[in-house]
Structure formats: structure tokens, C-alpha cells
């Protein structure tokens, strides 16, 4: 091997030993006739000293520049008193260089590797092979590897089998658009890249592989945001003969062990909260419990007021009027309130009413708000008591359809919590359970809240009689307001699966066309089964403190689903298109 040690492995225990390093020149300094090279590899940095007594190596060190690839032979020694660098893992020692071999030269990089804050993301992605040399980026990928190793070890130890499922499969309605791959051998037909291994892992349960896992690549052709990529990685898990409590316990233990091994963090038992409670208290099915702010329903106090903005939703069975108290924020400027009003409009809110509590003892005169005059004093006091308002607080109100109020005030809760730095802890894991089976659309039709293979907590007859109120056997793990993983007990009886399909408007012939293989499998002794899938990219993003999953993926796509480094997607030549029996209606425009 060309090296004996990684740079980041050097420490005082190696003092006096001769070692060989290979890496990149991170920095070169010439101090009074002595040349210092900071050599960098994936594990860290080491300082190598060259003095004029060794003419050949000194001359070589004098010629090297940043990002040259070098091989260094030298002896580890303690740094002189006063020269210890506490910012480096190997800062107590240095290497006295005996030999220096330049393995390759480098042009000046397109951006400095130690000062990247002013470099645009597109430039960083265009030169990703340079960007990944930065210690911050290398550390994220090292931690990602440790995370997957820990997860694999836990699942292996608990009897799970790592089984690969197909990448080329058929399109199924799973919510997002599929990436389609034309078939050369079947003209006019297309494969689809999997949005998840969902159906294949269920078929593995039917086949008797009762504990399955896979670190799976998944693909979704959807609009991107900070936590989305067109291709992403999933920790996919499925089991037979376990109920939801068993699966929750098994995977929660996995995550607790993971955080202990990788970050040395101890988590207690994760609290459980129903979907209904999460929406009412936090306006979200993935609440961030680090934030102490909560939504409080106040519609019962506003049904009789003349202010239609409140009384309308208060008397609407599908409406909601809720309050959000922000302690100590009564001094908030009007311009800030206007900014928050504009913010909630993104979620469909038509306005943002508020009450500033200056002196409650003075009654309505001690309150500052344009809406106080519309609310009887007794009702006003009940509302302020219910939300726990005291002098110095501000209370915001939302009034509209339940979904709009919940989403708008829920998002405002998160924004204010971040703006005012209200978080009470660093980590807040939890489970959300008892999700509705379906979401009702404006036209009265239904959409599966999770996916159409989730089992309900009722019989097929009860489900078809009351689909709008049916609950599912689904569960989501949430960490700091981010959904880490979602899962459910699956439907394992054909009659139930067909009932769900019917409620989703999938006709029998379409059921056979798209899911015939699954319905066939359910006829042949499918066991009770369920599972869960974690988003690996999101998990690594949270554990590294990254702002985007693009920071924890080696070669991510941009917000427009493009790879600026390889220039993908690209134009395909006419011959390849003919072989695929494809003709373009419009020629692609040159960029």
C-alpha cells in the first residue's frame, strides 16, 4: 500500500514512528526557511515540516502548490511548546518530512476549499469532485457511512435479510409522477423507476421472508424543495407476524441505538400522539416538539359575534377558529405583524387577527387590537384564560376552513419559534399514530392519506359505510418537525384491498391491470405484515445539522432536477430514439 496511515489517524501514540501519508496539499507556508505543508485526506489533516537539511525533499516542498497530490514519508514528533493547534485532531504532533513525491499536479481550483460561503451552490455542484474535498463535506459523507453501517448491523442482528428489489418495474399510482423508461424490446411500452419498493416487499412477505430490509434507491418526478430530490435513498423495512406496537418498538430502538453510537446521544421513550391531537395542538402531522407554542381552539366563544370573519368559520362544521399565544411578544412591531400576515397568506389565510395583551386588569382597555370591539368581554376573558395570556403576550388568530387554519397557524408557529429562538431542547423525537385512512377531496372523492395498501382499523363493510371517518393502522416517526419515517400495517386480505381500491375510484378492470399480481398474491396465504421506511437523506441531514439534503448526498441534483456537473439530463441522438420507437414532436432547444 502507498500509505501507512490516514492523516486524521495521527496522534501522540505514534511519536517517534516513521509513517507514510498520501493526500492533497491543503495549505503551504514558508516560515523562515522552514516549509510547512498541511496534508489532507478523507480522515483529516496533518502538518508536515520540511527543513533545508534534507535538500531533495525541501526543494520538492518548495515547488508544490495547493491541491497537488503528494506522498510523504516522515517521522512523527511532538510539536514545539506553543505550537500546538487545538483545532486539529492531530494538533499536538507534526511530521518531520524525509521524502516528498508529487503524484500529480493541480490547476488552481475554481474556489478556495477553506472559504466556501461566498461560492454559489451551482458552482459547487458543477465542481462537486472539488467541493467534496472540503473537510466539512467529507465529514458528512463519513457520518452517512457510519449511519448506514449502524442500521445494517442492527437489522442483521435482529434477523432481517437484505434483499434487493427491481429498479425497472411498472407504473403504479403512488401519488407522484413516475420516471418512465422506454422499452426497446416492447415497442410503445415503458418501465417505471420505483417510487418505493412497497409492492415488492409485500410480495416478499407473501413468499415467507418475514424480516426484510434494503437500503433502496427510489425515484419521484416531482417539484423539488430543501428535503426532496428526484432520486433518494430509503431505509426500507418490512415484517410479518408483528403488529404496529412491535414495529414501532423495534424501529424506535434502532434509532435510539443509532444516535447513541454515532452522536453519543441518549433518547428516552418516544412520546405518541394521535393525528387529530397533532393537528389541533400544532397544526401539523409532524409537529416540532422543541417549540413550546400551541394552537388553541376558541370557536365556541365566537359563534354569536357579529364579526363574520370569526362567526362564519365558528359555525361551520368544517371550519376552525384557533388562537396562537406568543409569550412576551406584545412589543412586536406592526411591520413584523404585517410580514407574518403576508406569510400565512401562502397557506390560504385571508388575514391574521391579533390581540396585544398590555394590562389584562384593565379589561378591554388594556388590550390593543382592532378586533376586541367585536367580542363580548366575558367571551374575551374565556379566550385569554384558555390560551394562558398574561401581560406582555400577543395572541394571533386564524379563522377559515379547518385545513387552512391548521396549516397557516402551524407554519406561523414554526416561523415564530425560529425567529424568536423559542426552542426548549435540541432533539424532540415522537410518533404520530391513528391517521385517517383517506383525505376527502372537494368533489367528495377520496385520496389515500398514506398509500392504498395501508390497513384500516375496521372491517371492509365498516370502511365502505364510513370512509371519511375511518382510521388507518399507520404510524410516522417525527424528529424536530421532520418526518423521518412512515409506515403501516398492510392489507393482507384480497377483499379489504378491493374495498380500498373501490373507495379510491379504481375500477375493477384497472385493479386487475395495475395490481393484478398483488391481488393474486393475496389469494395465496398472505400473512399479516407491516413495515416502515426511513428517509436516509433526511436522517443524515438532521444528524449532521445540514440545511439541505443536497449537502449529504455525494452527487445531488439541483432544484430543477438537473446535474450541472455531467449536464444530465441530456439530448439523445436520433438513432437511439429510433431504436426505442420514439419520435420527438418538438426538437429540444439548445441551451
From Swiss-Prot:
Catalytic activity: tRNA(Asx) + L-aspartate + ATP = L-aspartyl-tRNA(Asx) + AMP + diphosphate
Chain residue ranges for the region called Aspartate: 198-201
Pfam families found in the cross-reference section: GAD, tRNA-synt_2, tRNA_anti-codon
Coiled coil region boundaries: none
Enzyme class: ligase
Chain positions recorded as ATP binding sites: 220-222, 229, 483, 535-538
Entries under PANTHER family matching the protein: ASPARTATE--TRNA LIGASE, MITOCHONDRIAL, ASPARTYL/LYSYL-TRNA SYNTHETASE
HAMAP family attached to this UniProt entry: Asp_tRNA_synth_type1
Protein name: Aspartate--tRNA(Asp/Asn) ligase
Organism: Pseudomonas syringae pv. syringae (strain B728a)
Gene: aspS
Amino acid at each position: 500500500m502507498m500509505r501507512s496511515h490516514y492523516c486524521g489517524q495521527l496522534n501522540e501514540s505514534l511519536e517517534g514512528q516513521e509513517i507514510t501519508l498520501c493526500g492533497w496539499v491543503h495549505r503551504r507556508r514558508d516560515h523562515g526557511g522552514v516549509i510547512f505543508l498541511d496534508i489532507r485526506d478523507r480522515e483529516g489533516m496533518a502538518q508536515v515540516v520540511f527543513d533545508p537539511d534534507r535538500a531533495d525533499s525541501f526543494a520538492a516542498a518548495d515547488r508544490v502548490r495547493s491541491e497537488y497530490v503528494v506522498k510523504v514519508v516522515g517521522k512523527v514528533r511532538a510539536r514545539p511548546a506553543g505550537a500546538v493547534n487545538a483545532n486539529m485532531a492531530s494538533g499536538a504532533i507534526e511530521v518531520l518530512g524525509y521524502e516528498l513525491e508529487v503524484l500529480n499536479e493541480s490547476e488552481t481550483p475554481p474556489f478556495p476549499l477553506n472559504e466556501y460561503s461566498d461560492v454559489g451552490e451551482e458552482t459547487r455542484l458543477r465542481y462537486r469532485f472539488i467541493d467534496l474535498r472540503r473537510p466539512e463535506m467529507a465529514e458528512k459523507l463519513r457520518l452517512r457511512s457510519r449511519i448506514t453501517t449502524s442500521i445494517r448491523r442492527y437489522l442483521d442482528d435482529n434477523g432481517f435479510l437484505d434483499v434487493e428489489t427491481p429498479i425497472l418495474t411498472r407504473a403504479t399510482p403512488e401519488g407522484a409522477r413516475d420516471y418512465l423508461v422506454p422499452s426497446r424490446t416492447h415497442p410503445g411500452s415503458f418501465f417505471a423507476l420505483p417510487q418505493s419498493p412497497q409492492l415488492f416487499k409485500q410480495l416478499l412477505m407473501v413468499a415467507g421472508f418475514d424480516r426484510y430490509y434494503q437500503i433502496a434507491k427510489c425515484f419521484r418526478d416531482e417539484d423539488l424543495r430543501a428535503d426532496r430530490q428526484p432520486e433518494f435513498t430509503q431505509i426500507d423495512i418490512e415484517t410479518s407476524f408483528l403488529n404496529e406496537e412491535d414495529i414501532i418498538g423495534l424501529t424506535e430502538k434502532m434509532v435510539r441505538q443509532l444516535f447513541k453510537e454515532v452522536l453519543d446521544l441518549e433518547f428516552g421513550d418516544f412520546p405518541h400522539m394521535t393525528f387529530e391531537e397533532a393537528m389541533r395542538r400544532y397544526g401539523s402531522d409532524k409537529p416540532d416538539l422543541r417549540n413550546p407554542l400551541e394552537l388553541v381552539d376558541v370557536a365556541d366563544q365566537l359563534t354569536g359575534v357579529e364579526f363574520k370573519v370569526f362567526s362564519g368559520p365558528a359555525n361551520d362544521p368544517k371550519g376552525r377558529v384557533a388562537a396562537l399565544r406568543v409569550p412576551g411578544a406584545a412589543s412586536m412591531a406592526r411591520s413584523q405583524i404585517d410580514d407574518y400576515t403576508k406569510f400565512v397568506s401562502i397557506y390560504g389565510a385571508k388575514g391574521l387577527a391579533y390581540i396585544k395583551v398590555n394590562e389584562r386588569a384593565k379589561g378591554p382597555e388594556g388590550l390593543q387590537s382592532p378586533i376586541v370591539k367585536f367580542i363580548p368581554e366575558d367571551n374575551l376573558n374565556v379566550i385569554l384564560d384558555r390560551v394562558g395570556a398574561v401581560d406582555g403576550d400577543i395572541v394571533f388568530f386564524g379563522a377559515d376552513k379547518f385545513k387552512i387554519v391548521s396549516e397557516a397557524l402551524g407554519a406561523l408557529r414554526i416561523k415564530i419559534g425560529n425567529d424568536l429562538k423559542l426552542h426548549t431542547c435540541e432533539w424532540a423525537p415522537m410518533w404520530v399514530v391513528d391517521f385517517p385512512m383517506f383525505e376527502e377531496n372537494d368533489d367528495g372523492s377520496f385520496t389515500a392519506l398514506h398509500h392504498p395498501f395501508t390497513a384500516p382499523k375496521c372491517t371492509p363493510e365498516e370502511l365502505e359505510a364510513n370512509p371519511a371517518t375511518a382510521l388507518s393502522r399507520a404510524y410516522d416517526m417525527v424528529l424536530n418537525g421532520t418526518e423521518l419515517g412512515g409506515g403501516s400495517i398492510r392489507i393482507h386480505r384480497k377483499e379489504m384491498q378491493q374495498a380500498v381500491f373501490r373507495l379510491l375510484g379504481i375500477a375493477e378492470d384497472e385493479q386487475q391491470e395495475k395490481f393484478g399480481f398483488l391481488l393474486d398474491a393475496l389469494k395465496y396465504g398472505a400473512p399479516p405484515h407491516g413495515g416502515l421506511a426511513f428517509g436516509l437523506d433526511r436522517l443524515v441531514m438532521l444528524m449532521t445539522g445540514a440545511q439541505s439534503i443536497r449537502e449529504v448526498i455525494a452527487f445531488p441534483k439541483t432544484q430543477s432536477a438537473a446535474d450541472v456537473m455531467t449536464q444530465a439530463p441530456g439530448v439523445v441522438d436520433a438513432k437511439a430514439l429510433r431504436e426505442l420507437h420514439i419520435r420527438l414532436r418538438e426538437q429540444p432547444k439548445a441551451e
